[in-house]
A protein has these predicted regions:
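Classical secretory targeting signals
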Residues: 1-3, 60, 166
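Extended interaction-bearing regions that mediate binding to partners or small molecules
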Residues: 5-7, 11, 16-34, 43, ...
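Short, low-complexity, glycine-enriched hydrophobic/amphipathic alpha-helices that associate
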Residues: 41-113
Length: 178
């Protein structure tokens, strides 16, 4: 897994698009995250969906499961991402393996800025899987901000639903607790 220093160096080389007006003024902060991070964009999360295409464009340069992302803070992040091999096991063998970087971005960002008890949905057209994450309550575990969730994956007549807890890592990604 990359170190925070390598992620920071990678982030500084990335040229993420910023929304701004003609004068180059930075956009207004739209959403405060569960962990206190201020996010420029919510990618549809607050309305119960996830703009998978936009998130996919941002997380295309994933390094070891950690992405560059842009927040209003100096951490320079754009999107929260869920990481770890446990993601595949959580959802189920076949469907879990099909979670790609954009799906992980939607999952992590739903944990970060989603409202407790409110479903966030998106569809991966390439795999035919529709995902629904319902962020739950949160707590501090081992000094980390953690959040319970349920994740449902639907493909055709097959539905898998799992519950779990994810905690934010030192570099701002979310990792599922074993």
């Amino acid at each position: 897994m990359p170190t925070p220093a390598s992620i920071s160096a990678w982030n500084s080389r990335r040229n993420f698009p910023r929304e701004s007006d003609a004068a180059g003024v930075a956009p207004q902060i739209l959403q405060g995250g569960y962990t206190g991070t201020k996010w420029e964009r919510d990618y549809g999360i607050s309305s119960g969906s996830c703009n998978r295409e936009e998130i996919g464009a941002l997380v295309g340069g994933v390094i070891g499961g950690a992405v560059g992302a842009r927040t209003a803070s100096e951490e320079n992040r754009t999107v929260a991402v869920i990481i770890g091999a446990a993601v595949g096991a959580l959802v189920g063998s076949r469907i879990g393996r099909e979670l790609d970087e954009a799906d992980r971005g939607c999952f992590g960002h739903a944990l970060e800025i989603g409202t407790a008890g409110r479903a966030v949905r998106w569809n991966n057209a390439a795999t035919g899987v529709t995902y629904v994450v319902v962020p739950g309550s949160g707590e501090k575990l081992d000094g980390k901000s953690c959040r319970n969730f349920t994740l449902t994956a639907v493909r055709g007549a097959r539905t898998e639903k799992r519950a779990g807890t994810a905690c934010q890592t030192a570099i701002g990604t979310w990792a599922i607790r074993p």
